[in-house]
Amino acid sequence: IDGGALGTSLSDDGRWLHDNVHLLTSELQGVCEAFKAKQKMPLVRTANEAIIPRVIVLAEAYLAKTEYQFSDKNFASYVEAFQQQTVLKTKELWMLISALKLVLLERIVERGAQAIANPKQSYGVGVCVSSLRDTSQASWKDILEPLILHDHILRKDPAGAYARMDLETRDLYRNKVVEIAEYSDFSEMEVASEALTLARESQQRRERDPRVALRCSHIGYYLLAEGATSLHQRVGYTPPLRERISSFLRRYPDEFYLNSILLITLAMMSVVVLLLMDPQVSPGLTLFAMLALFLPCSQAAVQITNYLVTSLLRPQILPKLDLSEGVPDDCMTLVAVPSLLLDEEQVRRLVDDVEVRFLGNHDRNLHFALLTDLPDSRSEPREGDPLVDLCEELIEELNQKYAGHGMGSFLMLHRHRVYNPREKVWMGWERKRGKLMDLNRLLRNEYDSFPGKIGNLSILPQIRFVITLDSDTDLPRGSAQRMIGAIAHPLNQAIIDPEKNIVVAGYGILQPRVGVSVQSSGRSRLASIYSGETGFDIYTHAISDVYQDLYGEGIFAGKGIYEVDTVRQVLDRRFPRNALLSHDLIEGAYARAGLASDIEVIEDYPSHYSAYNR
């Protein structure tokens, strides 16, 4: 629409159309895409015998009653009153957004045509355009969540966790209810009620382990975890083909993963040999050629198998509690950064980085500590060191700077070097692993290996979780609270087998996704080639990971959050001294590490090949 089409001047209705043409175009495209998606929506027959989705009739009735003036409050009240007679499915509630826009667009077209035909008359186009804009800007999650009726049932969770979970996890639970209802004879309300009944029944059983009791009494246990089988049997759930394949793969992960790699490797080797080798070549030479092909073919087979796994299995999202308003007292956490003190510039940078992490994740129950050693020495070290004194002074300055702000505190815990007869040097016992083991003992008043201590030591016995980071690891805003919320969730709390003394359910350690900083990716040719996508994704979402999606466990890479008591019980004194060159993998196997791929930390990428190979 332009002024020339309507004469030299536009009417008020024409002006509304002219000024909002981009809004109308974009909303029309969005509505078309929404209704193109093939969804089974309840249909109704209108007065003129047309059969259309029920949500469109509901949207038309609401807008007609309000004279096409949208308000989130009266809309919620209208739908709530409607559901007292007829319960809407969850997908219908979400389709109401597009239905409202569709009805408004139809009315804008109708009134716009009238305005063009008779520009001197007012037809109220502006009211419809304003309502269309309001529907686009409305906070629909806040509007629609209270209208999901089976959500009210889930909030009766006997474990008391559902109402404290974050929005993404509540959506995960609700979508699971919708999926089960779609492939069973039960409605969404009935599926949620059966899950609640199972959770309440579990409370009648006496479990020796209180964590097992909490896990089984949580409604999510019957939606996402081992209890889902019981719920499926009760409601007569018939899973779709994709779900059957996923369940089969997760039930037999080793058989699928290892056999797939083996079969693909043998197939590739055989094809190459048959195509390139002369039939008259001796069997010995053929065997040698196949052995030479084994390594490259096996690597290709691993990549192909990984692709198959990530194509067949959806990314596994770990449920989380919502701690955005504050970390509770029973989840007090210490962010610990093990590091060596090398020179004055490096010490100042260490303390500056601790302050940056604090400012992005400050909370009264979140504290920050440097765990420090001095470099290895061939000779017996002397008492005192100016670098230690400098670090203590800088940590004290931080505590004074932020005192009285109602936030966490800063600590420095420094160890003396001890003689290692095997390495023949004076060094911090067991290096990084030793720092964390010594920290765990200090937190539980078992043994004090830190003669140098600065900060509020009274909080140490109350620490439940430790977030361990490397000195070059950034902790993006809010990521600490999300990690704590994940590991504190009832389905993620570690359950230890008393006989094997290993974690068999839940997780003792959670590893976030590790991204690469933009600055480090440009420091060398090696970093720019291998670092891939860099920077922090502010819309961090779950991504596929072969081991987490297939086995339900991730690979611990030394950065993440762990529960102090669990790690102490499972790992303390488990391995002989000076025996582990890389301790992260084996510790993650015993303590059961999980990957929270929708939480991200950022670190520097190695700038030279020797560092890359460590």
Q: For the regions a protein language model found, what residue spans apply to each?
A:
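Juxtamembrane helix-loop transition segments at the membrane interface in multi-pass membrane proteins
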Residues: 305-319
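Active-site acidic catalytic loop and adjacent metal/ATP-binding pocket
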Residues: 5-73, 467, 473-478
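Generic structural signal for well-ordered, non-transmembrane alpha-helical segments
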Residues: 18, 22-29, 101, 106, ...
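Short, charged/polar, low-complexity loop and linker segments
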Residues: 2-9, 81-85, 90, 149-157, ...
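Alpha-helical bilayer-embedded segments of polytopic membrane proteins, i.e.
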Residues: 98-107, 244-306, 512-516, 556, ...
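Active-site activation/catalytic loop segments of kinase-like enzymes and analogous catalytic loops
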Residues: 51-93, 100-114
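Internal catalytic domains of large membrane-associated glycosyltransferases
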Residues: 121-247, 316-614
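A structural signal for well-ordered alpha-helices, especially hydrophobic packing surfaces
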Residues: 2, 25-35, 86, 104-112, ...
